[in-house]
């Protein structure tokens, strides 16, 4: 396994990027919120965020191809250690929020696989509400994941491979079945084509549509995570940049195509208008509709068509459960590795950086498990309904995920100003193109977050949601500053002591 990772092929790198970035559940969420009108937003985010940002990562990764610290090393060499630590810590924190959200969401596909539909909103342990029950299960899930992950990277890689194959299979099913339905129905779309107006009443205001940009950006998140693989890629000076570019183009086209394909089988008002539909179960609602519509197009009986839809949902539930599991195992280790093993060891207590017999920072992983578990319990016992619970967690993850991109983008002009680097791949060949790309990406990410944060207040005076979205990132930023300043003072104090000892000997 070590040798395979050490020399990853171009195809292997592309597949790794694809499975890290392309989430099958993102296009159903987009169709639910915006219908076909989500596609222009996804294209906009691809052109003005994802593709230029991916090219920046390709340049930095190729230049720092021998570094093992991933994005921490890139920002450290480009700007400085304090900036790099705060940015990397925020990146790590965004994945903590992602784990809080996903540990709750993962029970929806499992329920769908077992029962043919989402039953999580009816689950109850004793006197606990469904939301509290899912929260307890999510905390237990985090313990199980950590217990297995600390046993070594081989265990993580095997589980991740299964998840990657599962999600790629789902994308193939959507493409082939939608194509078959379109042919059988004479080119008729269940949802009339309209790329300018959302069928969702809650996403027809200008403010709501602008806030949707953050969902599109979130869909393209994760490409920076492959930064730690650059030194394990075969001929990284050529293949790393090439892999990122190919994957970025395929992903950009793939999302837009998927959004259109959902309209082949699902009419928004008929399929998605129910109160029980939310961002947590939308994928399974749409896949049920896909299977049922295929049955109808094949002129099966209503009962047979409905049964086809149920089995599509069950297969999707199993595939999504495996995909979430694979992603969960990878992201419970990879960001933590960067923040613990990529940064100076003196930043952390020695027990945090100590590796177990399997080469894993076990103590740090268990502490992360505790942190995620506490957040899960706090949010799930907050009194929200299950639907609001899922939607709030999704918004928290969207905002937190996009903030680290600001740090990486700000670091890029400083990286370009370095004159001593061997740069095997250069796409931004002069200062104006560098500043233009940096400025565009910064504007897109900044305004997307601002619109998302203020939208609940403008639409309904909902300060609670706004405070939840703002509070998490601020807390982690202040925590990062506190940790780094404590480290800096300890280093300065140690240097002063050594200087006094040296003078005493003189």
Descriptions of predicted regions:
Residues 1-40, 44, 50-58, 64-66, ...:
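Membrane-interface "cap" regions at the ends of multi-pass membrane proteins
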Residues 39-40, 122-125, 130-132, 161-305:
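Helix-loop-helix junctions that connect adjacent transmembrane segments
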Residues 90-106, 225-229, 303-350, 405, ...:
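Membrane-helix boundary/coupling elements in multi-pass transport proteins
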Residues 135-185, 244-249, 394-407, 430-440, ...:
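Membrane-interface loop-to-helix entry segments
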Residues 2-7, 355-358, 402-454:
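C-terminal membrane-solvent junction of multi-pass transporters and transport-like membrane proteins
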Residues 29-40, 122-131, 154-163, 375-408, ...:
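Transmembrane helix-loop boundary segments of multi-pass membrane transporters
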Residues 73, 249-328, 349-389:
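TM-loop-TM module centered on a large, flexible mid-protein loop between adjacent transmembrane helices
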């Amino acid at each position: 396994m070590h040798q395979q990772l050490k020399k990853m092929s171009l195809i292997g790198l592309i597949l790794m990027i694809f499975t890290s970035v392309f989430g099958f559940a993102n296009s159903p969420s987009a169709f639910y919120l915006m219908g076909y009108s989500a596609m222009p937003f996804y294209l906009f985010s691809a052109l003005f965020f994802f593709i230029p940002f991916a090219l920046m990562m390709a340049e930095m990764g190729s230049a720092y191809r021998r570094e093992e610290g991933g994005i921490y090393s890139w920002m450290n060499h480009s700007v400085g250690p304090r900036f790099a630590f705060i940015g990397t810590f925020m990146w790590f924190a965004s994945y903590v929020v992602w784990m809080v959200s996903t540990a709750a969401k993962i029970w929806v596909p499992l329920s769908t696989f077992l029962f043919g539909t989402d039953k999580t909103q009816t689950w109850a342990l004793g006197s606990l509400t469904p939301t509290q029950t899912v929260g307890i299960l999510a905390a237990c899930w985090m313990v199980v994941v950590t217990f297995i992950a600390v046993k070594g990277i081989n265990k993580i890689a095997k589980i991740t491979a299964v998840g990657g194959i599962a999600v790629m299979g789902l994308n193939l099913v959507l493409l082939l079945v939608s194509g078959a339905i379109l042919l059988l129905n004479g080119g008729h779309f269940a949802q009339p084509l309209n790329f300018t107006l959302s069928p969702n009443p809650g996403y027809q205001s200008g403010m709501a549509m602008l806030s949707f940009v953050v969902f599109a950006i979130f869909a393209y998140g994760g490409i920076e995570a492959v930064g730690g693989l650059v030194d394990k890629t075969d001929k990284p000076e050529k293949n790393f940049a090439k892999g990122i570019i190919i994957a970025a183009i395929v992903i950009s086209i793939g999302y837009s195509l998927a959004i259109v394909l959902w309209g082949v089988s699902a009419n928004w008002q008929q399929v998605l208008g129910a109160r029980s539909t939310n961002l947590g179960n939308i994928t399974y609602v749409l896949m049920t509709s896909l299977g049922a519509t295929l049955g109808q197009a094949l002129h099966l009986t209503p009962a047979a068509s409905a049964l086809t839809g149920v089995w599509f949902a069950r297969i999707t539930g199993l595939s999504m459960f495996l995909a979430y599991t694979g992603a969960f195992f990878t992201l419970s280790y990879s960001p933590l590795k960067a923040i613990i093993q990529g940064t100076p060891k003196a930043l952390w207590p020695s027990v945090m950086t100590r590796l177990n017999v399997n080469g894993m920072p076990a103590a740090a992983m268990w502490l992360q498990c505790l942190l995620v578990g506490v957040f899960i319990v706090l949010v799930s016992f907050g009194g929200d309904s299950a639907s609001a619970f899922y939607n709030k967690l999704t918004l928290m993850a969207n905002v937190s995920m996009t903030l680290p991109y600001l740090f990486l983008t700000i670091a890029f002009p400083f990286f370009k100003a370095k004159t001593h680097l061997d740069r095997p791949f250069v796409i931004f060949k002069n200062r104006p193109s560098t500043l233009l790309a940096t400025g565009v990406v910064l504007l897109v990410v900044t305004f997307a977050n601002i619109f998302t944060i203020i939208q609940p207040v403008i639409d309904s005076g909902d300060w609670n949601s706004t405070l939840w979205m703002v509070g998490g990132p601020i807390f982690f930023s202040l925590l990062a500053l506190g940790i780094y300043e404590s480290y800096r003072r300890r280093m300065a104090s140690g240097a002063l002591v050594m200087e006094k000892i040296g003078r005493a000997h003189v």
